[in-house]
């Protein structure tokens, strides 16, 4: 990691000493600023007077054999535009990331050996590790390769969600010179400066930002941000090149993906098989019970008792920021009025939906997509269910007799459909009549960001502002609601460059309030997994 201590580390030490932040957040931010993880753990223990080291891993791990995992097997041909985590689970066995955020939420080097941030957090120097490609005679992975991948992800023609993370500090909006149907200028993005992504030498890449950003190393582990062989032009498939230990040898979408470890490459297993068992959660549980598979990507909450009864299965519970939101597209007339959107939130009983959909395994959400597990979460007034107020808002918006809508969802995992059914029943009391359209998962993936009203799952991110940037920043690829709020964008950019926990928490509180009053979602719950 960095050879010198960043100026802001002193502030982190003081915040830890003053108990403004806890030890885990100290380690997280210290490592983001370039401190090696062991050093950060040492300082956390020294300042608090308590031992604080990550749990040791077992040293004796058997080698060889085949591991089979039950998981959906989708198309994986365009890694930089992946929409779901399990897409990347196949590709990441072949291709690496520049960094890696572990289960402890600490980000460490992977294809970089270290990074250094300037005092103002606007210049990030990345030093490449000694990694090699599997093919092309085993040539070195270089700064030029990293730069190509970053530029490819930021190309608006590609449509990568990386744009949502980096738009605030590496991109600028430009006028395309064309108008939309309403006569407004059609905008696009481009890299903000010719030297924004600067190759110093084969080992050194410098990111020159237009705004300060503390989470650059975490952004580099966004799951579509895989480092692909530039010679393959962003396309991935059977036999593709990578820097990892495995090669994809077979792929049948909807059935299986088989990866084999390359001779002399590091690793413990010889082969890794992903087996697609479809939308039926019972089939997944049966496969695990009969030991046809060794593990599963995700199990349905309805089968929790079945899993608990399997002697050969260990179950661990973790509180997360995993969720799903009922999101409305603002470019559809039904949802343009913020009073209508707020009425959906006021008509939702989050606690009841939590109990029905996931048996209470999680916590009720507050309709702003920032979780209590995030270090920058701000506790604001709860938006309690209020049917009379919801009816009033609908009437003010021109719907005195209620409103008819259609909401799309998928059947797998089953809790998502159950959550939608629960909310739809609740909305009836406010005069919201919702038709539920359940699409097969593979069809839902094709339209998840296009349907006027849909229930979309969002995975955990370590910081509160990260999913806000991905999902609600104006004009970014994963802004499935077409939400646009200038004040929201301004506060979001401010939060991204603020390292002081207390100060950033206050900014997040303002963002949370905007989401509750003006936002495009009704969010019932957070999942524990």
Language-model segments: what does each one mean?
Residues 1-25, 34, 47-51:
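N-terminal secretory signal peptides
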Residues 70-119, 148, 241-242:
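N-terminal lobe/hinge region of extracytoplasmic solute-binding protein
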Residues 72, 249-260, 273-332, 355, ...:
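Extracellular/periplasmic solute-recognition and catalytic clefts
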Residues 102-106, 178-204, 208-273, 282, ...:
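Gly/Pro-rich hinge or "lid" segments in bacterial periplasmic/extracellular proteins
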Residues 114-165, 286-287, 334:
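Aromatic- and charge-enriched surface segment that lines or borders ligand/interaction sites
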Residues 127, 339-342, 433-444, 467-529:
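Extracytoplasmic/peripheral linker and loop segments enriched in polar/acidic and small residues
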Residues 154-156, 306-307, 331, 335-373, ...:
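Periplasmic-binding protein-like
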Residues 363-396, 411-418:
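Structural transition elements
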């Amino acid at each position: 990691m960095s050879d010198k201590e960043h100026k802001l580390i002193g502030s982190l030490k003081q915040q830890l000493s003053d108990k403004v932040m806890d030890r885990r957040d100290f380690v997280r931010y210290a490592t983001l600023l370039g401190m090696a993880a062991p050093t950060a753990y040492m300082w956390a223990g020294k300042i608090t007077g308590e031992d604080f080291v990550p749990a040791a891993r077992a040293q004796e791990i058997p080698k060889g054999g085949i591991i089979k995992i039950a998981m959906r097997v989708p198309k994986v041909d365009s890694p930089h535009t992946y929409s779901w985590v399990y897409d990347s689970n196949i590709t990441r066995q072949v291709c690496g990331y520049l960094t890696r955020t572990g289960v402890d939420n600490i980000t460490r080097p992977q294809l970089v050996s270290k990074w250094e941030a300037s005092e103002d957090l606007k210049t990030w120097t990345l030093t490449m590790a000694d990694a090699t490609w599997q093919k092309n005679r085993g040539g070195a992975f270089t700064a030029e390769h990293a730069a190509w991948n970053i530029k490819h992800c930021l190309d608006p023609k590609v449509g990568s969600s990386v744009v949502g993370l980096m738009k605030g500090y590496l991109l600028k909006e430009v006028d395309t010179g064309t108008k939309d149907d309403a006569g407004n200028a059609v905008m696009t993005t481009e890299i903000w400066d010719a030297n924004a992504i600067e190759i110093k030498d084969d080992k050194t890449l410098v990111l020159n930002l237009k705004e300060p950003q503390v989470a650059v190393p975490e952004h580099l582990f966004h799951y579509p941000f895989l480092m692909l062989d530039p010679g393959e032009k962003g396309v991935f498939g059977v036999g593709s090149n990578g820097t990892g230990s495995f090669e994809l040898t077979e792929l049948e979408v909807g059935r299986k993906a088989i990866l084999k470890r390359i001779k002399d490459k590091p690793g413990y297993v010889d082969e890794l098989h992903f087996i697609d068992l479809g939308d039926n959660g019972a089939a997944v549980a049966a496969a695990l019970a009969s030991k046809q598979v060794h593990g599963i990507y995700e199990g349905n909450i309805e089968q929790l008792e079945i899993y608990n009864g399997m002697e050969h299965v260990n179950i661990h519970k973790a509180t997360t920021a995993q969720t799903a939101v009922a999101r409305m597209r603002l470019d559809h007339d039904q949802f343009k009025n913020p009073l209508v959107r707020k009425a959906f939130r006021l008509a939702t009983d989050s606690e009841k939906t939590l109990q029905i959909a996931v048996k209470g395994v999680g916590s009720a959400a507050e309709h702003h997509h920032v979780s209590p597990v995030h270090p920058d979460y701000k506790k604001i007034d709860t938006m309690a269910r209020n049917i009379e107020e919801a009816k009033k808002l609908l009437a003010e918006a021109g719907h005195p007799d209620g409103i008819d809508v259609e909401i799309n969802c998928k059947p797998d995992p089953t809790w998502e459909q159950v959550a939608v059914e629960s909310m739809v029943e609740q909305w009836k009391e406010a005069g919201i009549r919702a038709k539920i359209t359940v699409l097969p998962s593979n069809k839902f993936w094709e339209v998840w960001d296009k349907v006027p009203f849909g229930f979309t799952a969002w995975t955990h991110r370590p910081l509160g502002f990260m999913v806000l940037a991905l999902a609600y920043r104006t004009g970014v690829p994963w802004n499935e609601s077409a939400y646009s709020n200038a004040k929201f964008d301004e506060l979001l950019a401010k939060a991204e460059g603020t390292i002081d926990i207390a100060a950033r928490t206050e900014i997040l509180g303002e963002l949370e309030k905007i989401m509750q009053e003006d936002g495009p979602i009704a969010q019932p719950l957070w999942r524990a997994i």
